[in-house]
Each structure stands twice: as structure tokens, then as C-alpha cells.
Amino acid sequence: MNDINFAVLGTGGIGRRALEFSADKDELTPIAACDRHGVAVNHDGLDVDELLAATEGNIASDGGTTVESGGDDIKEHGDDKGVVASTQAEPTETPIEDIIAEHEAIDAVLIALPNLEHDFIPTVAERFANAGYEGVLVDVLKRSRVIGMLDDREEQLEESGITFVCGAGATPGLLTGAAALAAQSFIEIEEVEIWWGVGLKSGYEDNRGTVREDIAHLPDYDIESARALSDEEIEEIVDAHDGVIEFNDMEHADDVLLERAGICDAEDVTVGGVLDLRNDEKPTTTTVKVTGRTFDGEVGTNTFELDDDTSMEANVNGPALGYLKAA
């Protein structure tokens, strides 16, 4: 297999773990990474250990607001902020453009940015296409409606030579694929239920984008209102749930992707789960249940479970990097 030089956009919880995960993949070499305020580039390969150590507990803003800063600051430890704390990095006000400027050296890009505006990820893809990038873009986006926005750019992406792999994490991603396989026992699908459990003892501080995006799925919230929440307000929501938040009927793109694969109608797919921000142990087992009718008239349910010891980071980044290599 050919060696793949890749970049990571976003060094929050998902981005950091992707860099760490890649260290065990000899064929993957991270050569660039950025957050809102800094960019690190080394065509020979980033020193991942140094970058992770420098940014530990110093993760860039997720795009929401803070009471003190109005949205421009990030959590600070010492004089430097986020990626800039690394000796490999430089401060910048145009991090994505700086990565795009290196596109000739980059085979693939993992987009690990919070999708707190519906068209944000599609717009990022468009910017790579406009720059003449030829390669792979992999995203772990969640929202169903974003798939259609990417469709609107399909011709442009193809003409540029970009392969865009969307929904490449756990849900959508790994669990969507499991549902598609489990569905093969049936000639007609009645229901697909995806129920996930995630434990993140590191809490909101180190998983800001993930938590903020999930809060947007709660009753009385949406992308716009979740984006407007301050860090303190999100902490209050977490505290009000004693650190354990349950989600139902989430707008995850598993529904659209399964419909496009000819598995079932999007309306027959439900996604929900439980997020524990006080413990690393999963609060519930991640499960996929596919109910359908077999060719001989029986109605049954195939069930697929993830082991409770496989973390969210492993189940998101493993598939994402796998798709990145395969594409």
C-alpha cells in the first residue's frame, strides 16, 4: 500500500485522537494540522507526540461563544493558544487556507471540525476544489441535510478530482455499515434502530465540538441556538443532567445513507443514545437493531453490538482513517 500524507482540520477531541491513532498506521503520515488560531506543517511528518503534549488541556474553541470573549477566545494554558503551543506551529488567522496552500503535498484530509453551520463542511470542500486540490476529503459529519448540500457540489468535486467520503465515523459510518450488512437477511426492512453509548470523563472541556453538536439535538435546541450558547451555559446543561444526557430521534445521516444504499426508507431509521461526561465507561451498550421480513415470511431482528471497551474515539477515528486509506 502506498504511503498517504494527510492533514487534519481541527484538533479537538476527534482530531487529536485521529493524530494519535495514525501513529499505529505505518502507511499514514500526518503532515499538517490546524485549529482556529494555529497551523502546523511538516512535509516529513509532524511530531505527533510533541503536538499532543503541547495542546493537552489547551483545545481550540469549537465555534461557540464564551461569556468573556464573545467567541474569539479559546481555553488557554500559558502564553500560547491551541496548536500554537506546539513548537511546530505558527499562529494564523486563516488556518484552512494555510492547509489548502499545501495541497500539492497532501493526499487526504480528515475534516474534524464542528459542523455548527449546516453548510460549513460543504463550503470547506468547495474551497479545496476551488484551489485545485486533487485527493480525498473525509468527514465525520452527522447531520442528514448536509448530504444534500454536498450533492449540490458533486460535479465541482468530481471535476476537481476530489473523492469526498461523508459520514465516515461511527454514526453515521461504522454503525451504518453494520445496519446495511444486517439488513441482507431480509427482503423488506421494517425498522433500523441505532442506539449509542459514549463515556467521556474528560467532559466538555476536551470535547467541545462533539458536545455542542449533540446538544443541538436536544428538545428546544437546534444548530443555531446551540452555537450561541456560552461555555458556561453548556456546562450548566451538563450539570442539569448530572453529566449524563440522553438523546432521541437525532438527525444523523444514517437515514439518508441507508436510503441511498437501497436498504430502507429514511423514515424507518431512528438514532439515539446516551452521553456520559463524568465517566469513561459507556453508559449503555452501542447497538444496531435491524428488523425485517425474510423471504420465507418470518419477521426477525438482527442485532449488532460494539464492545463496551471500544471507545468513541476508536469507533470514530478507526473507520474514518480506514475510509481515508481506502479512498
Predicted regions and their residues:
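C-terminal helical cap and adjacent loop that interface with cofactors, partners, or active-site loops
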Residues: 296-327
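Short, ordered loop/turn segments at secondary-structure junctions
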Residues: 36-38, 141-143, 169-170
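Active-site-lining helix/loop region of Rossmann-like oxidoreductase modules
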Residues: 9, 184-306
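A contiguous active-site-proximal alpha/beta segment in oxidoreductase catalytic domains
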Residues: 146-207
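Nucleotide donor/acceptor-binding cores
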Residues: 2-4, 135, 190
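Rossmann-fold NAD(P)-binding glycine/threonine-rich loop
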Residues: 115-164
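N-terminal glycine-/serine-/threonine-rich beta1-alpha1-beta2 phosphate-ribose binding loop
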Residues: 2-130
